[in-house]
Curated annotation (Swiss-Prot):
Its cofactor is Zn(2+). A motif ('KMSKS' region) lies at residues 309-313. GO terms for biological process: cysteinyl-tRNA aminoacylation. It comes from Bos taurus. This is Cysteine--tRNA ligase, mitochondrial.
Length: 555
C-alpha cells in the first residue's frame, strides 16, 4: 500500500489563494461574462470555448505564456484518437512560438492513479504504480514518434497528493466542499450558485456517481475518495483515500501557474464535466472571477464514416505504434493539418492517401527545384515577376490564416497552390531549355515551402538516409559520387557519335550491358531507400520513406 505523509501547502498555496491578479478588463460575453485579459496580444483570434466566439488571444507575458494540457490516464497504449488531439495542439503550440513570437510554458498532468489503472493492474497481477510507469513511458515514446514536442514539465498526480489535500482543505474552509461520515469529500455545487456552467452552460445534475452515494446533492462530485480494500491510498484529515479526477488537474495547474491561466486544452469530450468542474474548483479556491482565460478543445477522430468516435470503450481503435508501422508521422500530421483542430475528423485510408499524395507532390517539387538550382534540370527562363508575386501573396495568406484561429486548412491550401504554380513554371522552363536561368526566385519559393512545413512539424528534408548509418554528410557525398559515375557510364553507353547506321546499331548493342548495369544499380539503390531519376542529360536522386515509398528531398 502507498502511504504519503500529509504536508502543508507551502508558499505556493498562499500565493495561489490571494485571488485574481491585476491586469484584466471586463468584456461583454455570453452567460456568465468573460473578462478579457491584458498583456501581450499575440495577434491571433482564437475560438474560446468560454465565449463560443473568436477572441483576441492575449497572454500574460510573451516570454512565458501559461498552458495547461490534460494528459493521459496511463493504463493502456495510446491510440490514434489521442494522437490526433496531441498533434493538433502541438501544431498550435509551434505556430504560437514560431510565427507569433510567444514562448509557451506548458505543463501536462499525468493521471497515474485511477479506477481504470487499478482495474487493469489487477487483471495483469501487477501493482498500479508499476503499470502506470510502464504506460507513461509508452505514451512518451509515442509522442516522440509523432514528433510532438514534450511539455515544459510532466507532473504526476501521485507525486502531488499532499498539495491536493491542501487544495481540498481550502475548498472546505471556503465553504465549497464537505466531508462525509464515510471519509469522502465532495464539491458542493450549490455553493457556486449560478456561476457553474461557464463553459458549456449546463445546469448541475448527476454525473457518473452511484445513486446510493453519501453526497448532499446528486450533482456534487468527488474530491477525495475513501480508501477501499486492495487499492492504493494516502493519508488525509478525512481518513485514508485517494484524489478524485477533477481535483488533480486543478491542483497541478494552480501549483505551477497560480490564480491565472492563459490557455487550457483538451479533447472536446473533456469540456463537461471535467473542465467545467476544474473551473468551479479553481475559482472557488482562488476566490477569483476568472481562472482560465482561454479553453481550446479539439474535435474527435471518427471512424466508420464519421458516426463513431475512436475510443477504447468502443473497441474500434488503432494504437499509435501499429499505425506508425505502415504510415509516417509526417503523413499523419499533414492529415491533421487538413482539418480545423476544432472539428471532428474522419479516419479513412482515402484521407491518409490524399495527405500522402500531397506530401509526395511537395517533396517532388522541392527536389526538382533543387535540381534546377544545381543546374541538373535543364531549363530556360522562368516568369520571375509572376512567381515573386505569388510568393508574396502566399506568405500573406498563410500569416492571415494562422492568425484566424490557427486555420491550417487555408494555410496548407495556400502553400500547395504555390507548389502547383512552381511546378508549372519548372515544366515550362524544361520544355524551353534555352535562354537565361532564374534560380533565385525558385530558391526563395523552396525556402518558403520548407519553412512552413518545418514550422508545423512536417519534415520534408530527412538528413539521415539509412538508420544506423554514419555521418549523413559522408553518405550524401558517397551517393552523389555514385550517381555521377553512373551518369557518365550511361551517357557513354548511349553515345553513338558519327557512326553510320549499321556501325551505330552494333555499337549500341555492344554497350547494352552497361545500360543494363545502370538500371540494375538504380533498382538496387531503390531497395535501400534511394531513388534515381534519369533526365535529359542529367540524373538526380532523392530519398524514399521506407514505410510509404514517398520521396523525401535532401537538405
Amino acid at each position: 500500500m502507498l502511504w504519503t505523509r500529509r504536508a502543508c501547502g507551502g508558499a505556493w498555496l498562499l500565493r495561489a489563494a490571494r485571488g485574481p491578479e491585476p491586469g484584466r478588463s471586463a468584456s461583454g460575453a455570453r452567460g456568465q461574462g468573460w473578462l478579457q485579459p491584458t498583456g501581450y496580444d499575440t495577434g491571433v483570434k482564437v475560438y474560446n470555448s468560454l465565449t463560443r466566439r473568436k477572441d483576441p488571444l492575449i497572454v500574460s507575458r510573451a516570454d512565458a505564456a501559461s498552458w495547461y494540457s490534460c494528459g493521459p490516464t496511463v493504463y493502456d497504449h495510446a491510440h490514434l484518437g489521442h494522437a490526433c488531439s496531441y498533434v493538433r495542439f502541438d501544431i498550435i503550440r509551434r505556430i504560437l512560438s514560431r510565427v507569433f513570437g510567444c514562448t509557451v510554458v506548458m505543463v501536462m498532468g499525468i493521471t497515474d492513479v485511477d479506477d481504470k489503472i487499478i482495474r487493469r493492474a489487477n487483471e495483469m497481477s501487477v501493482s498500479p504504480a508499476s503499470l502506470a510507469r510502464l504506460y507513461e513511458e509508452d505514451f512518451k515514446q509515442d509522442m516522440a514518434a509523432l514528433k510532438v514536442l514534450p511539455p515544459t514539465a510532466y507532473l504526476r498526480v501521485t507525486e502531488h497528493v499532499p498539495q491536493i489535500v491542501a487544495f481540498i482543505e481550502r475548498l472546505i474552509a471556503n465553504g465549497h466542499a464537505y466531508c462525509t461520515a464515510k471519509g469522502n469529500v465532495y464539491f458542493d455545487l450549490q455553493s457556486r450558485g449560478d456561476r457553474y456552467g461557464k463553459l458549456v452552460g449546463v445546469a448541475p445534475g448527476p454525473v457518473g456517481e452511484p445513486v446510493d452515494s453519501d453526497k448532499r446533492h446528486t450533482s456534487d462530485f468527488a474530491l477525495w475518495k475513501a480508501a477501499k480494500p486492495q487499492e492504493p491510498f494516502w493519508g488525509s484529515p478525512w481518513g485514508d483515500g485517494r484524489p478524485g479526477w477533477h481535483i488533480e488537474c486543478s491542483t497541478i495547474a494552480s501549483l505551477v501557474f497560480g490564480s491565472q491561466l492563459d490557455i487550457h486544452s483538451g479533447g472536446v469530450d473533456l469540456a463537461f464535466p471535467h473542465h467545467e468542474n476544474e473551473i468551479a474548483q479553481c475559482e472557488a479556491f482562488h476566490q477569483c472571477p476568472q481562472w482560465g482565460n482561454y479553453f481550446l478543445h479539439s474535435g474527435h477522430l471518427h471512424v466508420k464514416g464519421g458516426g463513431e468516435k475512436m475510443s477504447k470503450s468502443l473497441k474500434n481503435y488503432v494504437t499509435i505504434k501499429d499505425f506508425l508501422r505502415s504510415t509516417s508521422p509526417d503523413v499523419f500530421r499533414l492529415f491533421c493539418l487538413r482539418s480545423s483542430y476544432r472539428s471532428a475528423i474522419d479516419y479513412s485510408e482515402g484521407a491518409l492517401l490524399e495527405a500522402r499524395s500531397l506530401l509526395r507532390a511537395t517533396a517532388a517539387f522541392v527536389e526538382d527545384a533543387r535540381a534546377y538550382l544545381r543546374g541538373q534540370l535543364a531549363g530556360g527562363p522562368i516568369q520571375e515577376d509572376v512567381l515573386w508575386e505569388r510568393l508574396g501573396r502566399t506568405k500573406a495568406a498563410v500569416q492571415a490564416a494562422l492568425a484566424d484561429d490557427f486555420d491550417t486548412v487555408r494555410a496548407v491550401d495556400a502553400v500547395m497552390d504555390l507548389v502547383h504554380h512552381g511546378n508549372r513554371q519548372l515544366k515550362a522552363a524544361s520544355e524551353e531549355p534555352r535562354g537565361p536561368r532564374s534560380p533565385a526566385v525558385l530558391g526563395a519559393v523552396v525556402a518558403s515551402v520548407e519553412h512552413f512545413f518545418e514550422t508545423v512539424g512536417v519534415s520534408l528534408a530527412e538528413r539521415q538516409c539509412v538508420p544506423g548509418a554514419g555521418s549523413p554528410a559522408a553518405l550524401y557525398s558517397l551517393v552523389e559520387e555514385l550517381v555521377r559515375f553512373r551518369l557518365k557510364v550511361r551517357q557513354f553507353a548511349l553515345a553513338s557519335g558519327e557512326a553510320p547506321g549499321e556501325a551505330r546499331r552494333q555499337r549500341l548493342l555492344e554497350r547494352q550491358p552497361l545500360l543494363e548495369a545502370c538500371d540494375a544499380l538504380r533498382r538496387d539503390l531503390a531497395v535501400h531507400g534511394i531513388s534515381i531519376k534519369d533526365r535529359s542529360g542529367s540524373s538526380t536522386w532523392e530519398l524514399l520513406d521506407p514505410r510509404t515509398e514517398d520521396p523525401k528531398p535532401r537538405s
